[in-house]
Amino acid sequence: MKFTLALLTTLCASLASAGVVITPVRPNQVIPANSGDCFFGVVTPQGCAPLRKS
């Protein structure tokens, strides 16, 4: 049980540090895109992200 929890925590930390965790953004966080910036989602000051609908 402890090993599984430690493994899961390590995996989550690894994915978060690699930038794999995707956080949807709201329309007021979007900035204008240059050509070729993002092939999916919208551009934010931190990078590309999916746009939250509401």
Curated annotation (Swiss-Prot):
Secreted protein required for appressorial penetration of intact host epidermal cells and for pathogenicity. Disulfide bonds join 38-48. Coiled coil: none annotated. Its main location: secreted. Keywords: Disulfide bond, Secreted, Signal, Virulence. It comes from Colletotrichum orbiculare (strain 104-T / ATCC 96160 / CBS 514.97 / LARS 414 / MAFF 240422) (Cucumber anthracnose fungus). This is Secreted virulence factor MC69. Residues 1-18 form the signal peptide. GO terms for cellular component: extracellular region. Disruption phenotype: Impairs pathogenicity. Leads to clear reduction in lesion development on cucumber leaves. Belongs to the MC69 virulence factor family. Induction: Expressed in the plant infection stage. It is found in: Secreted.
